[in-house]
């Protein structure tokens, strides 16, 4: 998921002007996967086929019993106005600020996680949600040398409205409902590690 230097150490880079800040580096494989799956969404939207609802994605962590889900989310093809292509994927080939919700900017996963983990960020940009993420993923935060506790992985795919979800009796499953179902299942099976705050099954 992230680009590593040695062992479980995670590489960082500087972005922003006039005052640069450090952010965590996504792996080239993660970047390529997101761009490839978003290309399907963009082509589908341009052709007005409207087969794909968007991306479903998971962040996962290696545990002794295997790989377990840490966070489940989605990035929809259509934006909030007039059927336009979502700004989260619109310029995915060249722009990493939003990057299908995994962008480098604040208010996106990489930017906000970096604020919680790395030194030098404005305290007002450090969100409780990502403090939780940082505690789950990294040996320590407020550091300039981030190190994973365990290996972390990323998976995503372009989700067709014709695809079946985990409950095949429901038939073709739309992206929003799929996300709801997957979070519910993961919270039941892996509730002690799942980082999603919304959509969890109540104990």
Residue ranges and their predicted role:
Residues 1-70, 74-203:
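Boundary/linker segments flanking structured domains
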